[in-house]
Amino acid sequence: GSSKSTLIQLISRLYDATEGAVRVGGVDVRSYDLEALRDQVAVVLQKNVLFSGSIRENLRWGNKDATDAEMEEACRLAQADEFIRQFPDGYDTHIEQGGANVSGGQKQRLCIARALLKKPKILVLDDSTSAVDTRTDALIRQALRRYIPETTKIIIAQRIASVQDADRIVVMDGGAVNAVGTHAELMKTNKIYREVYTSQNKAGGDD
């Protein structure tokens, strides 16, 4: 609706900006080799795809050379390791086509873990924790902030709770950037942000 996802697609050059420039590391993205650029960006969508195969095989789609230890670490950060170990076959559990035999929240966490195995410079979470509860959402964000601080994290979300501890928040409205700031700054200066925050808190924070 407000072009949040389109803005992100400019980074990996699924689209090119018609005016101005998008810079990564201070360099216009159009100056990078396209394959090299996309190798450094991992995007987790709200409805990412799992294929028929084991959990281990699905995870290695992000990095075919990933070790078992690296997979387990990525799953711990994505809050997936615990539920995987509850399956009788653990990481060898068979996933049906499209992830039909796991919940929406489990699927999202597996996709986040898979993206982490790519070891990207930029990690984009495009509404990709929408199916997990607010506590798990918070645990994922805390783990990413603590254990991969050198990775730039871009979080697209409807829930302000998912972004309010970000270094910088971009408010999108009607396909344009409406405001940029921290949570505290936007609460003071931006009517749209303040109204959304108030309405979500009244509704319990899950809107």
Where are these regions (language model features)?
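ABC-type nucleotide-binding domain
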Residues: G1-D207
